[in-house]
From Swiss-Prot:
This is Trigger factor. The gene is tig. It catalyses: [protein]-peptidylproline (omega=180) = [protein]-peptidylproline (omega=0). Its EC number is 5.2.1.8. It comes from Clostridioides difficile (strain 630) (Peptoclostridium difficile). Residues 163-248 form the PPIase FKBP-type domain. Coiled coil: none annotated. Belongs to the FKBP-type PPIase family. Tig subfamily.
Length: 428
């Protein structure tokens, strides 16, 4: 295989890859063996026709495309490594020549990462992030624990108010006709939670168990169901029960019942320690983000549009993954908010551009400083993964592809690079 850099303009390059005829012929034979069962040739059993017979009937190049598909994943990575180029998108491929003399000659046009001059990245000044935990923070966390461990108890003859839970049956009608998804039984509705359509919960305030209420509301214009968006509807609601939270006293008994501690003082100390650790981690993360952001601001880069679009793809894939845990996806989000996919992508463009720029700058600093991931650091990362997945380190390592291992080492290098930036920053 021979690789040549033909032309470079900005971040667009043209390269030529030549594969000698022997190697190409071997790939053509592989393609023939892989697909010969597809051809029915008179006088031959299916799959038994010689290659030359199939080529005579269908054309000499019948197996060329498959042969190129076999060769490309092997020769393309070799070529870009040899030429030291870093593609950011799939290449446009043209076949220049296929001959016995020259073999397979491919010309590829591809966008690569932009070249740029690093700005100053040492001695960056950033504001110190406070990570103190106050008594009020501790008290709020303890109260949160009390709320979380509260019991719901029924109260007779209690008029509903904010914070109460109504156990209701309901059915919705639009123009007198029941609509899909508008019916429920023994539903726990917290008054004031804004779980239902705007105006629904307010009409239950002051009502008691056993009462039946006619609730008139209008669905929001941006409601995800187009059939109901903006439509006035009526819900027939029966209040089966009214429940209120019964809060435990914040004392030693509470500590014993809800934790491994025997006293409230011990529980408080543990809560404070955990809050302080969270605050420190949060402050460290904010500091690291601030340093990276400042360093990126010091460097001018013309970000290729394709890199921005790929980053937006990643961001939306992550968003979709998170939404699926809540029982819906991107399409439902768009319907609920009345936005198009194009608008959603445009909203994320600026953040995507910043992320790409930061990534390019960190990679460049890593290279400039000669930062590498040691074998010990790699093994330590595998041990963390093994602990997280409750697996043996050897099994984790055996399951990783070479590309996965390089990704892990890349993450280690970037982490060390950010450590270097923070260590050299002025934090005041």
């Amino acid at each position: 295989m021979k690789a040549e850099l033909i032309k470079k303009e900005g971040n667009k390059v043209t390269l030529k890859i030549t594969v000698d005829n022997n190697k190409f012929e071997a790939a053509v034979n592989k393609a023939y063996n892989k697909s010969r069962n597809k051809y029915n040739i008179p006088g031959f059993r299916k799959g038994k026709a010689p290659r030359i017979v199939i080529e005579t009937q269908y054309g000499k190049g019948i197996f060329y495309n498959d042969a190129i598909e076999i060769l490309f994943p092997e020769v393309y990575p070799e070529a870009i490594k040899e030429l030291d180029i870093d593609p950011i998108d799939n290449p446009d491929l043209d076949i220049e020549e296929i001959s016995k003399d020259n073999g397979l000659v491919m010309v590829l046009n591809v966008e690569v990462k932009p070249e740029f001059e690093l700005g100053n990245y040492k001695g960056i000044e950033i504001a110190k992030v406070e990570n103190t935990v106050s008594d009020e923070n501790v008290d709020a966390k303890l109260q949160e624990m009390v709320e979380k461990n509260a019991r719901l108890v029924s109260v007779e003859d209690k008029a509903l108010e904010d914070g109460d839970t109504a156990i209701i049956d309901f059915e919705g009608f639009e123009n007198g006709v029941a609509f899909d998804g508008g019916k429920g039984e023994n539903y726990n509705l917290v008054i004031g939670s804004n779980t239902f359509i705007p105006g629904f919960e307010e009409q239950l305030v002051g009502k008691k168990a056993g009462e039946e209420v006619e609730v008139n509301v209008t669905f929001p214009e941006e409601y995800h169901s187009q059939d109901l968006a903006g439509k006035p509807v009526v819900f027939n609601v029966k209040i089966n029960d009214v429940k209120v939270k019964e809060l435990s006293a914040l004392d030693d008994e509470f500590a014993k019942d809800t934790s491994e501690f025997d006293s409230l003082d011990e529980l408080k100390a543990d809560v404070r320690a955990k809050l302080e650790e969270e605050a420190k981690n949060r402050a460290d993360a904010e500091t690291r983000n601030s340093v990276v952001e400042k360093v990126a601001e010091n460097t001018e880069i013309e970000i290729p549009e394709v890199m921005i679009q790929h980053q937006i793809d990643n961001m939306l894939n992550e968003l979709n993954y998170q939404l699926q845990y809540q029982g819906f996806g991107l399409q439902q989000l768009l319907e609920m908010t009345g936005r198009t996919m194009e608008e959603l992508r445009e909203e994320r463009k600026e953040d995507a551009k910043k992320l790409v720029k930061s990534s390019l700058v960190l990679e460049a600093i890593t290279k400039a400083e000669g930062i590498e991931a040691t074998e010990e650091e790699f093994k330590a990362e595998l041990e963390k993964m093994a602990s997280a997945y409750n697996m043996e380190v050897e099994k984790i390592e055996a399951s990783l592809r070479d590309a996965d291992k390089e990704d892990i080492k890349g993450q280690i290098k970037i982490r060390k690079t950010i450590d270097l930036l923070v260590d050299n920053a002025t934090i005041a």
